[in-house]
Regions:
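Short, small-residue-biased leader/transition segments that mark boundaries at the very start
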Residues: 3-4
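Helix-turn-helix repeat elements of alpha-solenoid scaffolds
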Residues: 13-27, 52-65, 92-104, 137-150, ...
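Post-signal peptide N-terminal segment of secreted/secretory-pathway proteins
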Residues: 23-118
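Structural register within alpha-helical repeat arrays
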Residues: 46-47, 86, 123, 130, ...
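Residue-level signature for tetratricopeptide repeat
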Residues: 49-50, 89, 126, 133, ...
Length: 210
């Protein structure tokens, strides 16, 4: 109904207003922080996360700020995380050549813990997306194969109770036509995310696709 539509538009407007205020607050801290590169990097990273699904150009801008700060600090560990995040941001928004370029800059043997999971997730996502848009069937299957191998590697390092693990299991099961299995994973996933959060919205979207 028109009333429902107006309510949803109002909710959306309120969300954008609150989101923008949150970003402006972090931005103010960022511009007031001088000299302390560690703090500036954390604030730039927070600005990336705040813009990740909100304003792509801003997300990329602040990741480049993170990369510049990591280089200035000669902090290779932070730099690997920055490269992975930027590769994934490009992959998620359709800039596949840029994503591949930043993936190639990552020093894979140097990655540890969560960095390994993030890397596998990025690779699986990127090659899956590239495969989807390829016209050549042989190349398409090659890229899907790469995506699946990185997905399996991701499963091997993630706890089976993590939201990311359950998310990818939902996609894998649904893609293979195992819809009941996908729904079971989705039920577990739903119990782990809070309502009215981006994580819940992500779960609800994939649940609606099963």
């Amino acid at each position: 109904s028109d009333v429902y539509k107006r309510q949803e538009i109002t909710k959306s407007d309120q969300y954008i207003k609150v989101k923008q205020q949150h970003i402006d607050d972090i931005k103010l801290k960022y511009h007031r922080t001088h000299g302390d590169r560690v703090s500036r990097h954390q604030l730039a990273w927070n600005l990336f996360k705040a813009n990740e699904t909100f304003m792509n150009d801003s997300a990329i801008h602040y990741l480049n700020e993170c990369i510049a700060l990591s280089r200035q600090m000669k902090n290779s560990t932070l730099l690997q995380s920055d490269y992975t995040a930027l590769a994934h941001q490009y992959a998620a928004t359709g800039f596949y050549n840029e994503a591949l370029d930043y993936l190639r800059r990552i020093d894979r043997p140097q990655l540890k813990g969560q960095q390994i999971a993030d890397y596998y997730f990025c690779c699986s996502h990127l090659y899956g997306e590239m495969g989807y848009y390829l016209k050549d069937e042989a190349l398409k299957q090659q890229y899907y194969g790469l995506s699946n191998r990185y997905r399996d590697s991701l499963f091997s390092v993630l706890p089976s109770t993590s939201s990311l693990y359950l998310w990818r299991k939902v996609i894998a099961a649904a893609s293979a036509g195992y819809y009941r299995r996908a729904m079971r994973y989705c039920d577990i996933w739903m119990n782990q995310v809070e309502e009215n959060t981006p994580e819940y919205a992500n779960m609800a979207f994939f649940r609606s696709e099963i």
